[in-house]
Amino acid sequence: NEPYRKTKLSGATEFPEEVRNYMEVIHYTDRCIGAFVDSLRSNGLYDNTVIAIASDHNQLLSPCGVPGYNDTEAAFIVANAGVKYTHTSVMGQIDIYPTLLDVMNCNDYAWKGLGYSILRTPVGSAAGWNGTVYGNEGDSLASRQIEAWDISEKIITKGYFSLK
């Protein structure tokens, strides 16, 4: 991915080119996030800002150092929120919005999304776009998570939010 700048990582010939490129992208991303946080601090915004980082897929190195694409695992990081919590179970992207509302104490919103806040509900499963349930397939939320994909698809494709 561009526009990262080559660093000494690019010349580390003990690693395959694909691994070096991956490390360059990670380095570039880390620098950009650092610059963003520095900008928040220098403009006096940091103390009143919740930083949320989410991905739509995962591009991790396997234990053998081989890059691989994974669309069932993704990062979700919330920083500077005043809440310390580590979620080690499965959750879906659909749970991000309600979780962020919870983190920011915006619980008076009329619409809380289609998922669940991981701070309030023990989410142990997530549904994929194709109806596959990840995590605990017997989770009581699983059928609703599958239904939420259908609702989400209809909202997006049927112009639910379009202006008339």
Where are these regions (language model features)?
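Membrane-interface soluble catalytic domains
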Residues: 42, 82-164
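Metal-dependent active-site segment of extracytoplasmic phospho-/sulfohydrolases and closely related
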Residues: 28-68, 101-104
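Structural recognition of the beta-strand scaffold that forms the well-ordered cores
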Residues: 52-53, 77-78, 126-127
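Flexible glycine/proline-enriched surface loops and loop-helix/loop-strand junctions
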Residues: 17-18, 79-84
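Feature representing long, continuous alpha-helical segments
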Residues: 20, 24-27, 31-35, 74-76, ...
